[in-house]
Amino acid sequence: MRQRNIKNLDERLAANSAFLIDDPRACRGRWAEIFGNDNPIMLEIGCGKGKFITSRAAANPDVNYIAAEGQSSVVLRAMEKAQESQLCNLRIFIDFIHDLRDYFEEGELSGLYLNFSDPWPKARHAKRRL
């Protein structure tokens, strides 16, 4: 289903900005510093509204989680869930990941979640597929 436009999107993103990474490429090699600890780091590509990643972060406070999503209107829902649960081990960024090496150094991630990614079935969308 298509995501509807959200009123006051920019203001609501700013209100939850503690979880938002503005320039994730600049964080390459510095994720432990950003979290302030050396806990394992797990990445979810395509977090959607954040149900999975926020539940994982709440259940595992000794693991750091990063959620990536390309649509800001969807990310807002994940950020609001993180704010409600006061998750200090979760960071979120808005971007479509094409190459993990642009965001993470080798060995920086401990694991990766890829749940229900967009299928992009048309031939002209091949470049968007995982």
Give a label for each model feature.
Residues 48:
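Conserved glycine-rich SAM-binding loop
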Residues 45, 68:
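Conserved beta-strand/loop positions that form the S-adenosyl-L-methionine
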Residues 63-66:
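Short beta-strand element of Class I
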Residues 75-76:
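Short alpha-helix immediately C-terminal to the canonical SAM-binding loop
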Residues 110-130:
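Mobile active-site "lid"/loop adjacent to the S-adenosyl-L-methionine
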